[in-house]
Amino acid sequence: SLANKIKKKFKKIDLILAPAMGGVIIGYEIGKLLKKETIFCERVNGKFTLRRGFNIKKGARVLIIEDVITTGKSSLECVKLIKKSNAKLVGFACLIDRTSKTKLKNEIISQVKLKIPTYNKKNLPSYIKEIPVTKPGSRFLKWLN
């Protein structure tokens, strides 16, 4: 299981940080299995923020858990919160790792690694040029704000 992989890789974790919305449930459940406190961050005016009385203690060893990591952008925003709190990032974990090129410097522990190609709009293969473009994810959904 993902919890067992995390336990083997990261010996010292004080806190789990999960970005809303997708990371909340997986972060909570992994935290329960590992007996670790879990908090989440949520977007306020487009930026991840700790709310609801959550905080990261100075020096805490923090694991970021998400449902899916594709570009790593949400994870990098979480890293900023950890640094701002003078805490330490121990690593990243997710159910599905879709990364190919990412700015995440730490190893990603995942249950599944998927290699799904992404294309620049100028270099689309002919067989997908006629398919309408959609952008999944919750980053810009207005109903969340």
Regions found by a protein language model. Give the residues of each.
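Active-site-facing substrate-recognition patch
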Residues: 1-12, 140-145
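Short, well-ordered alpha-helices that flank and scaffold nucleotide-derived cofactor binding pockets
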Residues: 4, 28, 32, 80, ...
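Short glycine-rich phosphate-binding loop at a beta-alpha junction
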Residues: 11-20
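Conserved acidic residues
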Residues: 14, 60, 90
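Short, glycine/charge-rich flexible loops or terminal/linker lids adjacent to PRPP-binding catalytic cores
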Residues: 26-63, 71-73, 126
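Acidic, divalent-metal-coordinating active-site segment for phosphoryl/phosphodiester hydrolysis
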Residues: 68-79
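PRPP-dependent phosphoribosyltransferase catalytic core
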Residues: 79-145
